[in-house]
Regions:
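Divalent-metal (often Zn2+) His-rich catalytic cores of metallo-beta-lactamase-fold enzymes
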Residues: 231-282
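Metallo-beta-lactamase
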Residues: 28-29, 33-40, 137-190, 204-205, ...
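Bacterial N-terminal signal peptides
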Residues: 12-23
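Active-site neighborhood of phospho(di)ester-bond hydrolases with catalytic His/Asp-centered motifs
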Residues: 78-80, 103-111, 130-133, 190, ...
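Conserved beta-strand hairpin/beta-sheet module of binuclear metal-dependent hydrolase folds
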Residues: 42-96, 199-211
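C-terminal regulatory/interaction regions
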Residues: 279-321
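Active-site-proximal loop/helix segments of hydrolase catalytic cores
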Residues: 184-240
Length: 321
């Protein structure tokens, strides 16, 4: 049964998750309110573009593209940012645009740069938090570690909420429509892709597609799920009629089809070369230093995340029939 191998794999995966997310540096003074900028990429769709370099003291972990959609009666927030303070800055940006109530916060997936600002919004009992039907389990499994890491980086004298309540999440399984007032948005849950619990948001009025981390722009894609099924999701995204888009990381001014073609090429390299490594009895420790390195100059933050992607692919594909 290769139990020793299974245990080693689980330990290595846990270590890699720790190394990935412990790099996030947080601080209370990420932005002054007036400097927290949002841009209107389509009528009623406002985006804060996160810092594009890797996590650093300078950008304080504010690296995700997050934002909000304004209807005639209320506002929907898409992702809450990397900390309570970043979430509060996003909330302040909303108030500079409109006084309409916030009726929905949609968390595209559990990763801390999208999740940990949630408590900036949940004090308002009139709003609803939405996420994938598998999101509550992921919050219960991961959020304590994320929050403890956040507190460590904030340092003494800063107070944070120590829990994110998974029971607040209204689960989405399939398609869910929300009317913000003469503006209907659709939340869609996906299968295994960037994670096993991604959702996207589409503003039907403007054709604006909020991809979360299903799609990256110039930033190396990050795999926390199944490489084969991720590519299938991207193929489906290529067939959507999208007028405007928001990706989870990176610039928003490149052609949509180019982004997907580049990302599918990278995942295809992972799939082909990891399978070949397994067939030739190349160890995981050797594979992470050989598979896919011809892609290095094509992606930002390659050195930070590529080995992790190889590891995730290897530990999945070694069990395929």
């Amino acid at each position: 049964m290769r139990l020793t191998h299974v245990k080693s794999t689980l330990i290595l995966r846990s270590l890699l998750v720790y190394l990935m997310f412990s790099r996030i540096v947080f601080a209370h003074d990420v932005h002054e309110p007036a400097s927290y900028q949002v841009q209107e990429i389509a009528q009623g769709n406002f985006v804060h573009v996160g810092a594009f370099p890797p996590h650093s003291l300078e950008n304080q972990g504010d690296i995700a593209n997050i934002g909000f959609i304004v209807g005639e009666t209320c506002v929907a927030v898409i992702d809450a940012g990397s900390s309570l303070h970043v979430g509060s800055m996003l909330k302040g940006a909303i108030r500079r645009v409109t006084e309409l109530p916030i009726c929905a916060v949609i968390i595209t997936h559990v990763h801390p740069d999208h999740l940990l600002g949630l408590n900036a919004f949940t004090s308002d009992n009139s709003l609803t938090v939405y996420g994938h039907h598998r999101l509550p389990k992921q919050i219960r499994t991961r959020s304590r570690f994320y929050l403890e890491s956040l507190e460590q980086y904030l340092g003494e004298g800063n107070t944070i909420d120590h829990t994110i309540d998974s029971s607040l999440v209204t689960p989405v399984n399939g398609l869910l429509s929300i009317d913000l007032g003469n503006r209907v948005i659709e939340i869609r849950s996906w299968g295994y892709a960037h994670t096993d619990h991604d959702v996207s948001v589409t503003d039907l009025k403007t054709g604006t597609f909020w991809a979360g981390d299903l799609v990256f722009s110039e930033h190396i894609p990050i795999l926390d799920s199944n490489v084969r099924q991720y590519d299938e999701v991207l193929e489906e995204l290529q067939n959507l009629d999208i007028q405007h888009y928001v990706v989870g990381h990176g610039p928003l001014d490149r052609p949509w089809d180019v982004l997907l073609t580049e990302q599918r090429r990278y995942l295809g390299v992972l799939l082909k070369e990891v399978r070949a490594a397994i067939a030739n009895d190349v160890s995981l420790m050797d594979a992470v230093n050989t598979v896919g390195w011809q892609e290095r100059e094509k992606w930002h933050n390659f050195d930070l995340y590529h080995r992790r992607n190889v590891t995730t692919s290897y530990t999945d594909l070694e069990w395929e029939d």
